[in-house]
Every structure is written in C-alpha cells, then in structure tokens.
Regions:
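Sec-dependent N-terminal signal peptides
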Residues: 7-10
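Structural motif
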Residues: 38-50, 166-174
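Tryptophan-paired
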Residues: 54-102, 177-258
Length: 306
C-alpha cells in the first residue's frame, strides 16, 4: 500500500511539472493572427495597376522586426503574423531606380533618387519612377478570436506628380544629336508615412526629352517642387549638335510651377518655354552624345499628353 501511494504521488507530481512546462511554452510562443489585406484602387484613375504591392508591418514595440509581404498584381490576399500592435506602409514594388532609405523606421522611411552629374558637371538627381502607396498609423492585432480573420483595407494614392514640357522657338533642330533637360527647386525624396517632402531639401532634376517636329517635348515624374520658400524653378536645356558643340539655354518657370494648385505635394504641371535660338552647326570639342554619369541608370518611359 505504501509503495502504491508513493507511486501515485510521483505520477501526479510528474503530471503537474509537465503541465507547467507546456504552459510556459504556450506563453513564450507567439500567437499568430490571420489578416486579409484588401486594396481599394478607387483613388488611382490616371495609371494602370502596378506589377505588385509591398506591405510592411512595423511592430510598435520593435520597429526593426518588420514583417514584409508582397501582393502580385495588387490583388487582395491573406497573411499571418504575430499578434501585436502595428503601423503599416504599402507601396508598389515595380520601382526600378528608387533608393529606399531608413526602411527600418515607420516615421523615417524615405523614397529617394540617385545622384547624377549633368552635362555641365553639376550635381543633380534622377527623376523617380511612378509611385503609389498608403499608410495606417494604428493596426491592433490582439485578442482575435480563433478562426476569425482581421481585415485591413489599404487605399493606394498617387505619390508623384507628372510634369510635361514643350520648348518652342528653336531653329535647326535637325542638327540636334542629343539633349537633356533639368529643373531646379525640386524635391528628390519623399517621406512615406507622412506622404510629405523634406522641409530643407532643394535639388535639380535631370531628365530626357525628344525632338518632335518643330518642338522639343518631354515628361517625367517628380515628388514635387521644393518646400523651401523662395527657391526658383529654373528650366535648363542642354543641346548637343552633331559636331559635338553643346548649347545651354535656361528660363525661370517658377510662376508656371507654383500657379498649379497642389493637394499636399501633388500637382501635375505642363511647362511651356519659348526661346529664340538657332542650334549652331560649327564643330565642338566633344562627341555628339552626352556622357551622363549615374549608377544603375534606368530609362523611365512616360506617356506625354499635350
């Protein structure tokens, strides 16, 4: 009887210790929530849906431990991640040429552009690709009943402006072998969670153009004009003739840029420039093309609507 009683005590003690061990493991193991991400595309009307969307979940207690999910075609989908409080940023991932900075911080995450040397050796920035996105400051994924799904709705909006331009009054366009254009007083970066421009940044953007009949035309995307007060917007046109001679023309277009109403930093602009200039035919010291130095230069094709 004593031996049986001792055996029973040992068995109950072992069960109790085992139960405690499993309970501790349960507390240490994170519970996962099922989240259905829905994209509402009603705010995008001037562009096709992107190749895909990237959604970044930032835990409020540890921003460095992000959870990142891709949604091809910008289609809805379900994901699982640990129960926690999050902040969320989404953006299209077909953004070749974009430089992402501070992506480990919700408040500092920035879309930036690469530096480039202009034909007259000035430091400028390339223009960004098309960008859309959304953000949510608070998503609570805690105490979700087992078997249920939390729905998160993201509404991407356009995050870049579309600038187009036309240059008139230039004679001898048949002598132009290459051309570039630039616009000063612009912003080369964008804060993603605030959808806002840096307050202290003013850069010149470098972009392409083309000869079309008796005009030079072009278009590009930009985050918008600089938020700095009093920064002029000067349009510079670089022309190189077939003999290698370079001409640089410039015109202040600040009024045209700032006369367009903006929503936040977004406002599409069409610039009209009128010159009285003839492209020279005499030879220059260089070749007929520009040597633009930029890391991983990517051509961005933009539809031009005039």
């Amino acid at each position: 009887m004593i031996r049986i009683r001792f055996s029973l005590v040992f068995i109950f003690l072992w069960i109790g210790l085992t139960a405690c061990e499993h309970k501790d493991l349960c507390y240490d193991h994170p519970h996962f929530a099922t989240v259905r991400v829905i994209f509402d595309w009603t705010k995008i009307s001037n562009h096709d849906k992107p190749e895909g969307m990237r959604v970044v979940f930032y835990p409020t207690d540890d921003e460095s431990n992000t959870w990142i999910f891709d949604f091809p075609g910008g289609e809805d989908g379900e994901v699982e991640l640990p129960e926690n409080d999050y902040r969320v940023i989404c953006f299209n991932y077909d953004t070749d040429g974009m430089v992402w900075k501070e992506n480990g911080s919700y408040t500092l995450f920035t879309a930036d552009t690469r530096d480039v040397r202009s034909p007259d050796n000035r430091t400028m920035a390339v223009t960004p690709p098309w960008l859309c996105g959304d953000h949510i400051d608070e998503v609570i994924l805690k105490d979700i009943p087992e078997g249920s799904t939390k729905i998160i709705r993201l509404t991407p909006v356009n995050m870049v402006c579309h600038y187009t331009y036309e240059v008139n009054g230039i004679r001898g366009l048949d002598r132009v072998a290459d051309l570039r254009a630039a616009l000063s007083g612009m912003s080369g970066s964008l804060n993603m969670s605030g959808d806002s421009l840096p307050a202290d940044l003013s850069e010149s953007l470098l972009f392409d153009g083309m000869v079309s009949r008796n005009q030079i035309i072009g278009g590009f995307y930009t985050f918008g004009h600089s938020a700095l007060e009093g920064e002029p917007n000067v349009f510079r046109l670089y022309l190189k003739n077939r003999s290698g001679s370079m001409s640089v023309l410039e015109q202040d277009v600040s009024d045209q840029v700032h006369d367009v109403p903006v929503a936040g930093h977004i406002g599409d602009v069409h610039l009209v420039l009128n010159f009285d200039y003839e492209v020279p035919s005499e030879p220059g010291s260089g070749g007929p093309g520009f040597d633009v130095d930029v890391d991983d230069w990517d051509d961005v094709n933009v539809d031009i609507v005039l």
